From Swiss-Prot:
Annotated family: Belongs to the RecO family.
Organism field: Streptococcus agalactiae serotype Ia (strain ATCC 27591 / A909 / CDC SS700)
Protein name, as recorded: DNA repair protein RecO
Keywords for the protein's UniProt record, in alphabetical order: DNA damage, DNA recombination, DNA repair
Spans through the membrane: none
Function: Involved in DNA repair and RecF pathway recombination.
GO cellular component, one term: bacterial nucleoid
Gene Ontology terms: biological process: DNA recombination; double-strand break repair
InterPro entries listed in its UniProt record: ARFGAP/RecO, DNA_rep/recomb_RecO_N, NA-bd_OB-fold, RecO, RecO_C
Pfam family for this entry, one: RecO_N
Length: 253
């Protein structure tokens, strides 16, 4: 085994034998790994075994089996997220999305930092629905999906009232609408936002203000994109879909 010091985000844990746990952690430098924690309920690591906990870990890495946690410090527990069902549901979804986007034991520091920053912004109170949309758009390439939301697939002009074409897997400008009789007839303003989401840097993001009607259009479009081009169906996504139907009863103004 080798020793590695790295930041990590706990994805989930599950019971193993009587009092042990298997804990999956997405680390910045070692990728996603499964860790064995003996006597977890009595372990000094119990505080950092919960999902959506970030810490600086000292790890014993086994490339051919289970790894071990040696120590930890600098714990970030996302108290605001964990105290709000809606924030927690969306945070759990993007975490699950990151989990399925890459293989185990493969380092992806860029994705780790992106996920960590997204969670921090949700914790800070920025719009969790739009942050989730941005995460979904920028994660598409991890699934091998390269869609251009910037310019027309035929003439490459930008800044026009575009529509999306499944036939050409891209945007059509008004001069080329005729190329696809089954184009989606989408709101061009929504596609403009999707284009911005594709390239936005979180360091530049101070506030988010998107009307509910536009949020719904974005949600429906991204659901369509993920269904057709990615094809994954996560339990955490179904849960946030259900929130839209019954969650308003619980949501405070």
């Amino acid at each position: 085994m080798r020793v590695s010091q790295t930041y990590g985000l706990v994805l989930y844990n599950r019971n193993y034998r009587e009092d042990d746990k298997l804990v999956k952690i997405f680390t910045e430098t070692e990728g996603k790994r499964m860790f064995f924690v003996k006597h977890a309920s009595k372990s000094k690591f119990n505080a950092v075994l919960q999902p959506l906990t970030i810490a600086h870990f000292i790890l014993k890495i086994n490339d051919n089996g289970l790894s071990y946690i040696d120590d930890y410090k600098e714990v970030l527990a996302f108290q605001e997220i964990n105290s709000d069902l809606f924030k927690l549901s969306y945070a759990s979804y993007i975490t699950s999305l990151a989990d399925v986007a890459i293989s185990d034991n493969v380092a992806d520091a860029q994705l780790f930092i992106f996920l960590k920053k997204t969670l921090e912004l949700i914790e800070d109170g920025l719009d969790y629905e739009i942050l989730t949309n941005i995460f979904e758009v920028q994660l598409l390439e991890r699934f091998g999906v390269a869609l251009n939301f910037h310019d027309c697939v035929f003439c490459h002009r930008a800044g026009l009232p575009f529509d999306f074409s499944h036939k050409y897997s891209g945007l059509l400008c008004p001069n080329h609408y005729y190329k696809d009789e089954r184009r989606n007839h989408l709101d061009p303003n929504m596609l403009h936002l999707i284009n911005r989401f594709q390239s936005i840097q979180f360091d530049d993001l101070q506030t988010i203000s998107v009307k509910p009607e536009m949020k719904l259009k974005i949600r429906q479009f991204l659901d369509m994109i993920y269904d057709e081009y990615v094809g994954i169906h996560l339990k955490s996504k179904k849960f946030i879909d259900d929130l839209s139907s019954w969650g308003s009863i619980m949501k405070s103004d």
